[in-house]
């Protein structure tokens, strides 16, 4: 996979990812569940660029070189000590991470089917491949932008960031507003990412809830944030007792692992209707709240609050987390809509870490198979549905009583 005409010294000189902590917290929270409950699971992930007309092929060798160096990384003693200090991380998991590295044999990078496309597939044990997604996407982004935007307008980026922060800082009615940075995978560069976090910490005070990036949380002394991602619920389609019960199974295993900690449930793997059918009184009272990641956030929030009331759970004690393509103005609208009715929190990604005046890439890497079986996400936004088996997708829709695509 490595480009043979570039020396190892040159590889190290251009490394984008220099720490295995340079990823999102929810990867570690899910990975711990995998270690304890599904250590033998085999999975496949596939990369997709949703932005039309992007030509990444000229940069294939650079991407391969960066991924090669990623696979040489190990956790340092300082990093392991930091993880050990997180209340929900168990000692045997940290011991495992002390032996961990990303297996280069499990990632395949080549040309895609369409002009300019590249293909990235990860295939292997879930426990050993789960940490590929975030750094690989960050690599693709940074390689692309350092070649196509050689002179970034940093001052424009800083101006945009300050104007966003001012929307909150200048409004006394937003005293309880909390926002987190969620932008690792689509960041313009790691240097810009770090500036965003350090600036928000310095200027936003209590309004800055933290970051999903574990390395930056450690460096800057802010809270690392995250619970579960789509891949966890998708994998449970293949790991649970039967497909119809897979969402309940996933939530029950999560509760068994964390015993009430990390209590934000993800709602959109099967759409909101299916989520509410499964999120019964037990889960309403057990979990701290839920995360919105597709569909109309205002409708979603109102439905969830009504569902809590119907299940005798006080919405004012619950947290609604919004993270779907958020901007500061939209987050502020949502904060006003639900003020005094529940707790709200916001995770803003691309609009923070890749807003320097050009179009960011819309790239994803999603799980498509687990234990040889197709898996799928059928969200409240049709364009986010990703599955390589139409027959399975149709069956999934039937089982969860979802409308046809």
UniProtKB/Swiss-Prot annotation:
Group of enzyme by EC: ligase
Involved pathway(s): Cofactor biosynthesis; NAD(+) biosynthesis; nicotinate D-ribonucleotide from nicotinate: step 1/1
Sites of Phosphohistidine modification: 230
Gene Ontology biological process: NAD biosynthetic process via the salvage pathway
Catalytic activity: nicotinate + 5-phospho-alpha-D-ribose 1-diphosphate + ATP + H2O = nicotinate beta-D-ribonucleotide + ADP + phosphate + diphosphate
Keywords, comma-separated and alphabetical: Ligase, Phosphoprotein, Pyridine nucleotide biosynthesis
Gene Ontology CC terms: cytosol
E.C. designation(s): 6.3.4.21
CDD domains: PncB_like
Superkingdom to which the source organism belongs: Bacteria
MF (Gene Ontology): nicotinate phosphoribosyltransferase activity
Record note on modification: Transiently phosphorylated on a His residue during the reaction cycle. Phosphorylation strongly increases the affinity for substrates and increases the rate of nicotinate D-ribonucleotide production. Dephosphorylation regenerates the low-affinity form of the enzyme, leading to product release.
Role played: Catalyzes the synthesis of beta-nicotinate D-ribonucleotide from nicotinate and 5-phospho-D-ribose 1-phosphate at the expense of ATP.
Family: Belongs to the NAPRTase family.
Protein name: Nicotinate phosphoribosyltransferase
Naturally occurring in which organism (per UniProt): Bordetella parapertussis (strain 12822 / ATCC BAA-587 / NCTC 13253)
């Amino acid at each position: 996979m490595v480009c043979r005409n570039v020396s190892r010294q040159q590889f190290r000189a251009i490394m984008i990812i220099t720490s295995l902590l340079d990823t999102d917290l929810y990867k570690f929270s899910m990975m711990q569940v995998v270690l304890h409950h599904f250590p033998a699971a085999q999975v496949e992930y596939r990369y997709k660029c949703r932005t039309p007309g992007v030509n990444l092929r000229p940069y294939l060798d650079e991407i391969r070189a960066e991924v090669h160096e990623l696979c040489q990384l190990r956790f340092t003693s300082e990093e392991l000590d930091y993880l050990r200090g997180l209340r929900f991380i168990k000692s045997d998991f940290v011991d495992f991470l002390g032996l961990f590295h990303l297996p280069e044999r499990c990632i395949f990078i080549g040309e895609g089917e369409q002009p300019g496309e590249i293909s990235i597939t990860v295939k292997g044990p879930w426990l050993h491949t789960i940490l590929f997604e975030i750094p690989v996407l960050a690599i693709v982004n940074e390689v692309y932008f350092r070649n196509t935007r050689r002179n970034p307008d940093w001052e424009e980026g800083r101006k945009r960031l300050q104007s966003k922060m001012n929307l909150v800082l200048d409004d006394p009615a937003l005293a309880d507003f909390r926002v987190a940075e969620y932008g690792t995978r689509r960041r313009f560069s790691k240097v810009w990412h770090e500036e965003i976090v350090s600036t928000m910490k310095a200027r936003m005070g209590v309004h800055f809830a933290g970051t999903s990036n574990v390395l930056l949380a450690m460096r800057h002394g802010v809270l690392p944030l995250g619970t579960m991602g789509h891949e966890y619920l998708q994998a449970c389609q293949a790991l649970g007792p039967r497909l119809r019960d897979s969402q309940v199974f996933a939530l029950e295993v999560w509760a068994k692992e964390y015993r009430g900690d990390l209590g934000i449930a993800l709602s959109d793997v099967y759409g909101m209707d299916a989520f509410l059918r499964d999120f019964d009184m037990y889960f309403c009272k057990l979990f701290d709240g839920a995360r919105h990641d597709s569909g109309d956030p205002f409708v979603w929030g109102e439905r969830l609050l009504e569902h809590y009331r119907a299940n005798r759970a006080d919405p004012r004690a619950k947290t609604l987390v919004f993270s779907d393509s958020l901007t500061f103005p939209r987050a502020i609208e949502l904060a006003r809509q639900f003020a005094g009715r529940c707790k709200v929190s916001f995770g803003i990604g691309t609009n923070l870490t890749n807003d320097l005046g050009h179009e960011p890439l819309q790239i994803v890497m999603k799980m498509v198979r687990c234990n040889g079986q197709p898996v799928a996400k059928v969200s409240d936004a049709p364009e986010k549905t990703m599955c390589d088996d139409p027959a399975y997708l149709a069956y999934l829709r039937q089982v969860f009583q979802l409308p046809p695509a």
